[in-house]
Amino acid sequence: TLFGVLPDTEVEAESTILGLCTGDADSIMPAIQKTYWDGIDLVAAAPILFNAEFLLPSRQANDPDFAFWRVLDSGLEEARNFYDIIIIDTPPSLSYITINALIAADGVLMPLPPNALDFASSAQFWSLFTGVCSSLFEARGETKQYSFVDILLSRVDKADLISNDIRNWIVSAYGPKVLPVEIPKTSIAASASAEFGTVYDMDVGSAQAKTLKRAHD
C-alpha cells in the first residue's frame, strides 16, 4: 500500500510470485512493475499468496525431486542481472513463502521491537528455521550461508524503562548482530502510515518540525 497499490482490490495473481508457486512461471520477471519512484520496481503481494501454503506442499508430495524451498531462489535468477539490490519483505511467520525468501536471500535484516513477546518470538523463529533448514539441506547435501544477519531495533521508546531492559537482553543475546542504528517510536510514523505513507512523505508543516526531524534522522 505504501507504493500506491491496494492489495485486496488492485493485485492480480499475475502480479505476484504465485505463478512460481503453481509452476506456471519459472521467472519473476513478468510480475515486476514500475513504481512512481525512479529506479524502484515492485512485485506485489496480496492475500492470494496464502494459496502457496497449499500449492507448494502439494507439489512436493507429488514430486519427490521438487524442492519447494528453492522456488523463489530460482525465480529470481534472471532478475538478479538487472538490479543492484533486491529486498524481500515477509510476514513474521515461518511459512512456505518465508522459507523461500530466506533461502533466496544473501543477507537477513530482522526488525525487532524491544518487547518481551517480540524478543521471545524472534528466538523461537530462529530455532525453528534452523531446525527446518537443517533437515532440508542435510537430506540433499546442501548448505546455506548468509553474508550478514543483522537485528534492527524498531519502535524504540527510550523513556520506557522496561523497553530499555529488554533492549539490553536483545544486545546480550544477539551481540554484534544488533545494529547501532535504531528506529524510534513516534506518533509521526503512526500518522504517516494511517495515510498510506511514510515519514518521508510528510511535510514539515503537517507536524512539529522537531518530532519530524527526529523521525527522519
Regions inferred by a protein language model and the residue ranges of each:
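P-loop NTP-binding core
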Residues: 1-217
